[in-house]
Amino acid sequence: KLLPVYQYLRGRADKEGGEGLTCGEEQILHKVDSTVRRGAQGLLLGGFHTPNHRWAIASLLMACSRLFDSGRMEQAAYTYLNEGIDCNEDGEFAEKSAGNYNRINNDAMILLSEATGDPAYEQAAIRNLRLMLTYWEPDGSIFTANSTRFDKDRLIYPKDYYMEYLKMGMKYNIPEFLQMCNTIFDIVDRQQITSPDFLIWFMLHPEYRKLEIQGGYRRSDFEGFYQESGIARGQREGFTYTVMNGKSSFLYVHNKTMKLEMKVAGSFCEHRAFKSEYMERISQGEYHL
């Protein structure tokens, strides 16, 4: 979160005829500048552990290459980006981490577009945000059972997607994204959880503070089959259902107050629970595993 703070303070310091910085703010800028520069230099050494680390590293290197006019940082960023972005046409990233790492990836894609001027990166974020509109449950939580990371089956609410919906909704005039911003705050209020981390972004982009959108996102009944991701999601009369390929728990039903998880178990030599090898759609709401 230091980068937007640095951009905000540096923008005010560089602004001709602007309000300038107070003595205290100048001291903060000096410390943050040193931290960001040293951090960017450290990222040049490379090294990552999981897929989402690539995009976090690449996006920060690219942004810092613009801030510090560094060709080395830009070149290092492209060594990661040349691998290709692991977001499929469904909008799902490789780790399928709807509860955490997908939004980390979205932040990285948006930052890459801002730094390079190439809108192709943030299109991956837009695809994922559209997918996420089908991933929230009747109680306002996110469907996380498909994740391959620590957030699997955890109770997580979508508050950290707020700024992504706001940024992309405003930039591309997507009403459902802006309505989802209101819905996220409704969920925050209803669940009595902390609000999204938005203050520094509102300071950095005053245009966000001027936006007024009435009403939240009201999702009608739907049925979607994301074949490349091996998952189907649907909603009927207040409950959601999920069918997944390659999972021992292949069916989930959620009605706001209760979640049902289904598996077929047996015992034959090394085989235990049933896991499908393929998934096909027979008709609307009907799937064959």
Q: Which residue ranges define each predicted feature?
A:
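Aromatic-lined, polymer-binding surfaces characteristic
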Residues: K1-Q123
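Extended polysaccharide-engagement surfaces of secreted carbohydrate-active enzymes
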Residues: P119-L289
